[in-house]
A protein has these predicted regions:
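The conserved acidic donor/metal-binding loop of glycosyltransferases
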Residues: 86-88
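Short, charged/polar "capping" segments at the starts of alpha-helices
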Residues: 13-17, 41-47, 124-125
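Active-site-proximal specificity loops/subdomain of glycosyltransferases
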Residues: 36-81, 92-93
Length: 165
């Protein structure tokens, strides 16, 4: 399974695209398609695996989640990866673990809306979820903080869309 990485941004932070692209391609892969979702196209060239999609007129913050929901309703991706625009990679990504996550999502019959790619969950209240090829997977308990986060996660598109208000 090959999925795209989507990164919502705003005009004020378009300048972050260049350093993000550099660190992403250095520490992960130029084979992953990265799609920035913003408003005004940046005035610099993007690497071949990066593209910018304008969500329309940059009118108000109140419309931001509506613009994202409308965009994600317009695509057919079953799964997508998402992070925030200021979450740059600082070291090599373990591609084998990422591939294991994709393999699990393809093979499991369990309902999953969001699969976190960061290790932060183990510092909050969690419980064992499943084991896949020798790796333990955990889920946040209902009382845990930040059960939904846009940082480095794989989302089932339908699940993501229903959480935009």
């Amino acid at each position: 399974m090959k999925i795209k990485l989507y990164i919502p941004t705003c005009d004020k932070y378009n300048w972050l695209i260049q350093p993000f692209a550099y660190t992403f391609n250095k520490f992960w892969s130029e084979d992953i398609e990265v799609v920035y979702l913003g408003y005004t196209n940046p005035n610099f060239e993007l690497p071949n695996n990066f593209k910018f999609v304008s969500l329309g007129k940059n009118d108000s913050l109140e419309n931001w989640s509506t613009d994202l929901r409308n965009y994600f309703n317009s695509i057919n991706d079953e799964w997508l990866m998402m992070t925030v625009d200021d979450s740059m990679l600082t070291s090599r990504t373990d591609s084998k673990l990422y591939d294991l996550a994709l393999d699990y999502l393809q093979k499991t019959d369990r309902k999953i809306g969001r699969f976190g790619l960061e290790r932060d969950l183990v510092t909050r209240e969690h419980q064992h979820w499943d084991t896949h090829k020798g790796f333990n997977l955990v889920e946040a308990k209902n009382e845990a903080t930040h059960r939904i986060s846009m940082r480095w996660s794989i989302w089932k598109r339908e699940y993501l869309v229903k959480h935009f208000v």
